[in-house]
Each structure stands twice: as C-alpha cells, then as structure tokens.
C-alpha cells in the first residue's frame, strides 16, 4: 500500500559488526511470530511498510566467517580490489553527500580502514541502497552498527547541526526511552568526524529522493559480544525498532501532570501532549473515569501539532454528586492519531470541601508578633 509510511532498517555496513544484524533478525522474527497473537504488532505491520537489509556487506561478512568461523574476525571493509592493489572500501564512507569532504572523516589511502573509494557510490553495495531509497519514500532509516550504546544523528561530515535538529532529537529521545543510549552527532558521541556516510546522504540529498530522517545506532559493548550480551542487545533495541516504525507515520505521546487531589466541585486535569511522528494528523483525546455518575468530563476538541511541538491541554471535569472522603478516582485518557494510540490511567483522590483553604499567595489572613512569628487571624 503506497499510502503506508515506509521505514528502512540496515545492518552490517561493516563486516565485523554482526550484532547489528542479529538484533534485526530478532525483531523480524518477533513481528512474524506475534502478528496473529499481538494486536499491537498486527496493527503496526498492517499500517507500515518495513524494509530490511540485514547484511549490506555480504562479501566482507563472508570473509570473516571464512577466516574466523567461531567469530572475532576483524575485517571491516568490503572485498573489492582497488586500483593500487589494496583491498576493500569502507561502505560507510562511500555515500555521495559530502563524499571526500576531507581526509579526517574518511581516507584516500586504500590501506586505511576508512578508505572511501575512487568516487562516491563506486561500490555496488552503496549503489543498491541508493536505488532502494530513490525507488521508495522512506520517512525514517535506521542504519545499525556496533558498538558503544549510542545513537548518532547528522551531521557527520562537520560539527554543525541540521536545520531539523529539534526533530531529530525528539525522535531520538523516543527511540532511546528505555535503553538510554547517548544521543548526538558523530563528533559529540564518537569524538571524530565522518564523511560519505549513510545518514548524511539519506538526510541531506533531497534532489535524487525525499528527505529521510536517518539514524545510526551503535549497539552493544563490543564488535563480537558474548552470547549473554547478544540477548541483551536484542532486547535493548526492540523498542527502538518499534518506535522508528510508528514514528514514520503519525505519533503523539500523552502525559498527565495534575495534582493528586481533585477539586470538590470542578477543576482541570492537565495533559502534556508531544508530537514525535513525521506525518501530520488530527490528535484526538478522550477522557473517562470510574465514577461516571458522579463526575462529568468535558469533551476535548481534536487538534494538530507541529512535529516536536508540545502542548498542555486542560481537561475540565465537574463533580455533580459528592464522593466519599478520600475515595480514589481513576481517570483514563486515550490518545489517537492516525493508527497510533496510547492509553494512560491517572489515580486521584477526592477529599471533599475543606473547612478552610488558603492558596498562600498573600498574608491577608495572617498576623505576626515577636512571640508568635506567624499565626492565623481568628
């Protein structure tokens, strides 16, 4: 369905980073095995187009498998022969945007591990991904690498931020909600520049194709993690993969930030709404409580937000029949935008009408003396 938001996942640009592929295969199997068992998985798959390239560099990966069948092969580049009889091009220095910008972020030396090749897109592997991106309309791309537990955003070729830095960071904050990866540009996370990389081209080239919000997660603690660490990596990247898929379309998140005690007659519940999704759509919120005969809640008019925008929404409630002292009230809020939805429950307490109340914003009801610094006027 061409109307469905499209997402690209890639792994193994570098041959010695198998955990990047392992977590992707784990995610793919999870979707397949749970499609008919988990309503959320089914809704995601039915409303998104997900494209997976688990091994961008098959020749390099096969070489490591041949030389080190038990693991720990450290060949990085592909296996192409260069004109100077050296071997291998770093595929993640071979993309066309700011290719060869300088010799700091990539190398002109064929023996170097960051050798960028004779020209931009000289390699069949990067040309294949270029054609894939031109053919499709990816809103988000996630190009997995190892290692370091970080999430890299453009730009890589220099130290400047993109004009969409706020949008990149709101997406990255959602991606890393649970794994808490460190987020930033290559310089801020790795302490060095990179040029000719996938993220810069996917985001920066808007002539050959659309703009893609492209990210590079560097997963795990090592190039060849232990068996136990592999399982941890697979779990830590699950939410990131789901978040990338959802955020390619319409997504808005909801939080509730009101006092625990509800007013005796009427009051407002404060909701904080943040749009993280790329596609614009109506945001619809419904509210209910477990005392519908005693508390009436006003309807909330649908609205829209810009990407990365946050808004506080006040939800008015009316207590039409008093509740018992200290009775618990559970409010349920449901947010829907496009196919994405969230439900949160907020627990409040009803205390009734107080005997006396002071907002403490002035001292009109108070007096002081030497022996009694502050006392209530009778």
Regions found by a protein language model. Name each.
Residues 355-378:
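Extracellular glycan-recognition surfaces and repeat-rich motifs
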Residues 1-79, 129:
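Active-site-adjacent structural elements in enzyme catalytic domains
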Residues 294-324:
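Intrinsically disordered, low-complexity Pro/Gly/Ser/Thr-rich segments with frequent PxxP/GP/PP motifs
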Residues 263-279:
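Short beta-strand elements of extracellular/lumenal beta-sandwich folds
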Residues 67-266:
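Metallocarboxypeptidase
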Residues 266, 280, 310, 324-330:
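Extracellular Ig-like/FN3 beta-sandwich strand-entry sites
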Residues 318-353:
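Terminal connector regions
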Residues 274-294, 334-335:
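Short acidic, flexible loop segments centered on an aromatic residue
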């Amino acid at each position: 369905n061409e109307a469905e938001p499209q997402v690209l996942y890639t792994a193994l640009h570098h041959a010695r980073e198998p955990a990047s592929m392992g977590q992707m295969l784990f995610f793919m199997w999870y979707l397949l095995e749970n499609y008919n068992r988990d309503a959320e998985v089914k809704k995601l798959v039915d409303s998104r187009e997900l494209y997976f390239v688990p091994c961008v560099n098959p020749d390099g990966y096969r070489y490591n498998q041949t030389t080190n069948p038990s693991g720990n092969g450290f060949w990085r580049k592909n296996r192409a022969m260069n004109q100077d009889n050296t071997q291998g091009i770093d595929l993640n220095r071979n993309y066309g945007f700011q290719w060869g910008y300088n010799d700091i972020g990539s190398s002109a030396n064929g023996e170097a591990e960051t050798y960028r090749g004779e020209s931009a897109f000289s390699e069949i592997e990067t040309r294949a991904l270029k054609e894939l991106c031109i053919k499709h309309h990816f809103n988000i791309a996630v190009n997995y690498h190892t290692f370091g537990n970080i999430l890299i955003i453009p730009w890589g070729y220099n130290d400047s931020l993109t004009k969409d830095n706020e949008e990149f960071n709101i997406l990255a904050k959602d991606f890393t909600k649970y794994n808490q990866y460190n987020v930033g540009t290559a310089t801020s996370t790795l302490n060095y520049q990179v040029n000719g990389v996938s993220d810069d081209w996917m985001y920066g080239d808007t002539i050959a194709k659309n703009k893609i919000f492209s990210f590079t997660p560097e997963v795990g603690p090592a190039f060849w993690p232990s068996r136990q660490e592999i399982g941890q990596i697979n779990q830590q990247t699950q939410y990131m993969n789901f978040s990338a898929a959802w955020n390619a379309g319409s997504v808005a998140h909801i939080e509730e930030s009101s006092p625990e005690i509800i007013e005796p007659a009427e009051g407002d519940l404060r909701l904080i709404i943040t749009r993280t999704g790329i596609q614009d759509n109506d945001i619809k919120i419904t509210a209910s409580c477990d005392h519908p005969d005693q508390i009436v809640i006003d309807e909330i008019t649908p609205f829209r937000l810009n990407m990365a925008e946050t808004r506080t929404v006040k939800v008015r409630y009316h207590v039409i029949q008093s509740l018992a002292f200290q009775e618990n009230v559970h409010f349920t809020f449901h947010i829907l935008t496009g196919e994405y939805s969230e439900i949160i429950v907020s627990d409040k307490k009803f205390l009734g009408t107080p005997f006396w109340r002071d907002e403490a914003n002035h001292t009109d009801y108070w007096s002081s003396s030497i022996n009694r610094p502050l006392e209530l006027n009778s």
